[in-house]
Amino acid sequence: MAVGVEPGKTAYNPLYIFGDSGLGKTHLAQAIGMDIKQRHPELQVLYVSMNKFQAQYTTAVLNKEPNDFINFYQMVDVLIIDDIQELSGNKGSTQNAFFNIFNHLHLSGKQLILTSDKRPSELSDINDRLLTRFKWGLAAELTQPDYETKVKIIHNKARSLDGAENIPEEVVAYFAENINGNVREIEG
């Protein structure tokens, strides 16, 4: 909530959201971005996956425009990077470009939001200077939903389906007790 109210002005910069696949990291990061945009319509909020970031950077290098690429990203007020772990193994220019963008935004009081399926300490093949920066703010772990949360998810999903809003509580309880997976598995 604090990130949405005062992006870049809290101790939660960067906000590093991590957890297993299917727990809602991307959804949460996008929701935070939308909240920021609603509260601060004047701010430039950019969401991009790390794979897309890398593809764009590669194209910029091939076109001899890496500085234009970096300048573009340095102009945003809120940068949301999904699946930051995909930066692993890309030693060299892509990590250097991201390092420069990260530093510029952070020093300028801009908000960074990163998602990953790993804790910062579990990332491999990423420069130490980047890993250190990932730990500057708040690392928030998303975990498997508990029973009560599963029940709420099932009820919400049922309400979104025609004719399924009156699902018997015994059925809801059965699913909540027997589905051990992530939110995607609960929603079907």
Language model: regions and residue ranges:
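Post-Walker A helix-loop "phosphate-sensing" segment adjacent to the P-loop in P-loop NTPases
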Residues: E6-K9, M34-V45
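Walker A/P-loop nucleotide-binding motif
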Residues: G8-A29
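Short glycine-rich substrate-engagement loop in P-loop NTPases that contacts/grips substrate
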Residues: E42-V76, G92
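Structural recognition of the conserved hydrophobic beta-strand(s) that form the central parallel beta-sheet
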Residues: Y47-V48, I80-D82, Q111-D117
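Short regulatory helix/loop adjacent to the ATP-binding pocket of P-loop NTPases
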Residues: T58-L62, P120-W136
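Conserved AAA+ ATPase "SRH/arginine-finger" region at the nucleotide-binding site
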Residues: E122-S124, G137-T149
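Short conserved motifs of the RecA-like P-loop NTPase core
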Residues: E165-N178
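The conserved phosphate-sensing helix
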Residues: I179-G188
